[in-house]
């Protein structure tokens, strides 16, 4: 298990004036997208146990209902509809061989959902699509070659010479890792404009209940579908580009002795999920050391003085870290709001939260 800390400044705040340096990477636009279909978390247990033909598992259903009620998630957007599940019944059992079916759907749908977010980011950026020099695509949903980056290049009509990088199976750490990677690419390629796209669809992890695997119920409750995109570059052109955030620094740390705490494993039945009960506590116990290393060069040690874009892996993680750091209730407000409205969006989650932070800041003129 690893943590990534990225130091950002907003371009309208006083702290931006303090740290802004020519040549630093800046986020120039953000776009997000979700499937039109969505589920209400309060009624989802009824749907889930009905569509998987598991209504006879009454105790298990009540357990799932309690998990959903405690999740602090209001709704989630899902590509999976009742019609799609009825056409593909192998997705509704727990361990039936179904990887081919899942892959066939994901290979097509992941780039399409990514395109929606990318087009929104490109529109906000306001520059010709031909000026995009790099494409980084990230997903935990499916694996193929040519990859989703190649398919998105064709869907968007990017230059055939665009420099592409495909990132598969990076999990929840991927959102912050994409910020780090985009910063490195932008600052190493002066004048370049990097399109970063994170697109996640949970078809690979959806399956019927298992009496032996409680982790599966958590996965069915927690994850949602969505895509997010951003344009990153250095030295914005006056009157042509409007920077939103500046990427000051980024660091990644492996937490010792956590190899088995959080795992996604690809099997013939799809992607299986394991999350140790210790994850919230372990993250809370280790996060401050990471923060100290990241912010000490800038003389910052008051964690309530900074704005937070915290990946909300789950409500218990948010609560535990907030308590451990002594944060005020508003510090994680954007993270909690995204978790409530979309669930855990894996790699796309951090960019959704960035978008939420900038929208709230603009609304409040902060």
Curated annotation (Swiss-Prot):
Pathway membership: Secondary metabolite biosynthesis; flavonoid biosynthesis
Example GO BP: flavonoid biosynthetic process
EC number per UniProt: 2.3.1.74
EC supergroup of this enzyme: transferase
Transmembrane segments: none
Active site residues according to the UniProt entry: 172
Keywords in alphabetical order: Acyltransferase, Flavonoid biosynthesis, Transferase
GO MF, one annotated term: naringenin-chalcone synthase activity
Record-stated family: Belongs to the thiolase-like superfamily. Chalcone/stilbene synthases family.
Biological role stated in the UniProt entry: The primary product of this enzyme is 4,2',4',6'-tetrahydroxychalcone (also termed naringenin-chalcone or chalcone) which can under specific conditions spontaneously isomerize into naringenin.
Name of the protein in question: Chalcone synthase B
GN (gene name): CHSB
């Amino acid at each position: 298990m690893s943590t990534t800390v990225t130091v950002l400044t907003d371009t309208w705040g006083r702290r931006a004036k303090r740290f802004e340096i020519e040549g630093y990477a800046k986020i120039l636009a953000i776009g997000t997208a979700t499937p039109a279909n969505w589920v209400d978390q309060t009624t989802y247990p009824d749907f889930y146990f009905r569509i998987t033909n598991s209504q006879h598992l009454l105790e298990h259903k009540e357990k799932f209902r309690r998990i959903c009620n405690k999740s602090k998630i209001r709704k989630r957007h899902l590509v999976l509809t009742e019609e799609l599940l009825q056409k593909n019944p192998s997705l509704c059992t727990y361990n039936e061989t179904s990887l081919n079916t899942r892959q066939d759907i994901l290979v097509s749908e992941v780039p399409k959902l990514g395109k929606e977010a990318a087009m929104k980011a490109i529109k906000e950026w306001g520059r010709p699509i031909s000026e995009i020099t790099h494409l980084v695509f990230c997903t935990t949903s499916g694996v193929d070659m040519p990859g989703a980056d190649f398919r998105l290049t064709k869907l968007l009509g990017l230059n055939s010479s665009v420099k592409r990088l495909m990132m598969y199976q990076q999990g929840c750490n991927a959102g912050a890792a994409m910020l780090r990677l985009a910063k490195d690419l932008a600052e190493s390629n002066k004048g370049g404009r990097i399109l970063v796209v994170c697109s996640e669809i949970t078809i690979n992890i959806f399956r019927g209940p298992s009496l032996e695997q409680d982790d599966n119920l958590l996965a069915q409750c927690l994850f949602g579908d969505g895509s997010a995109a951003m344009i990153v570059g250095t030295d914005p052109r006056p009157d042509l580009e409007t920077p939103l955030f500046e990427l000051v620094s980024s660091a990644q740390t492996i937490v010792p002795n956590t190899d088995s705490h959080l795992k996604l494993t690809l099997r013939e039945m799809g992607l299986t999920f394991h999350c140790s009960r210790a994850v919230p506590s372990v993250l809370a116990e280790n996060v401050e050391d990471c923060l100290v290393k990241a912010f000490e060069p800038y003389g910052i040690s008051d964690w309530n003085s900074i704005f937070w874009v915290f990946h909300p892996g789950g409500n218990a993680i948010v609560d535990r870290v907030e308590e451990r750091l002594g944060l005020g209730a508003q510090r994680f407000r954007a993270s909690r709001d995204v978790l409530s409205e979309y669930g855990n969006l894996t790699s796309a989650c951090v960019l959704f939260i960035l978008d939420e932070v900038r929208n709230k800041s603009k609304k409040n003129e902060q």
